[in-house]
């Protein structure tokens, strides 16, 4: 039964392919995201840029606020829990959230263990910066993977690094002989069946999105051309000068990511992008959480 549920969850996540998932803080923003063509919204009280600016401990959002967003839109609603905080996950499941993001954006609740995602009916999204992290999260029951990037910076460089790293490691696994896959599985600390899947199919067993630092239509198209199957946009939309226009442009960029003419047209006159922070100017806080 649990196995059937996991297959169903993976298929649910497949339905988001080619889509944009936007961080929203209230019903009004959620409606803007839905009108712009978002595939889903991520309900959270403080977007990554604010979490980074304020510091301190960041936790799961207020269930009342999440329910207000659920009531405002007809597209799927996601919400974040702290790494390893299975009770926050139980609460989100109780309010019938569509997806749970076990997220490094929030302060980790457990430095060693992630949530046992197989104990839940709801599909989980998890971040990964390389193939090992991705397969370990999938082994725990994640139905969807995203790059970690460095959230709240508006700097795409980390997301690019993570996506390229994932692609390189997948190609390396594909080039191994069958009998070498057992050693690869041991090195990655994952079940050999997952490594065999990557070897045979040249991709992860679940959908792989890009996240962290996506601020422009060009950023979104870049991640798609690098192999992402969709994108998460956090601070990039509602920290910009014209959120409605930018949200719509990023959705169009993901659909038309291989068409420079369309990308040029939709990139015009979007107002100020969010103020970015260069990765060399900050301490990398979030990408290193949860290995």
Swiss-Prot record:
Its EC number is 4.3.3.6. GO terms for molecular function: pyridoxal 5'-phosphate synthase (glutamine hydrolysing) activity. It comes from the Bacteria. The keyword Ligase does not apply. Keywords: Lyase, Pyridoxal phosphate, Schiff base. Coiled coil: none annotated. D-ribose 5-phosphate binds at residues 23, 152, 213, 234-235. One of its GO terms (biological process) is pyridoxal phosphate biosynthetic process. The active site is at 80 (schiff-base intermediate with d-ribose 5-phosphate). D-glyceraldehyde 3-phosphate binds at residue 164. The keyword Lyase applies. Pathway: Cofactor biosynthesis; pyridoxal 5'-phosphate biosynthesis. It catalyses: aldehydo-D-ribose 5-phosphate + D-glyceraldehyde 3-phosphate + L-glutamine = pyridoxal 5'-phosphate + L-glutamate + phosphate + 3 H2O + H(+). Belongs to the PdxS/SNZ family. In the presence of PdxT, forms a dodecamer of heterodimers. Catalyzes the formation of pyridoxal 5'-phosphate from ribose 5-phosphate (RBP), glyceraldehyde 3-phosphate (G3P) and ammonia. The ammonia is provided by the PdxT subunit. Can also use ribulose 5-phosphate and dihydroxyacetone phosphate as substrates, resulting from enzyme-catalyzed isomerization of RBP and G3P, respectively. This is Pyridoxal 5'-phosphate synthase subunit PdxS. The gene is pdxS.
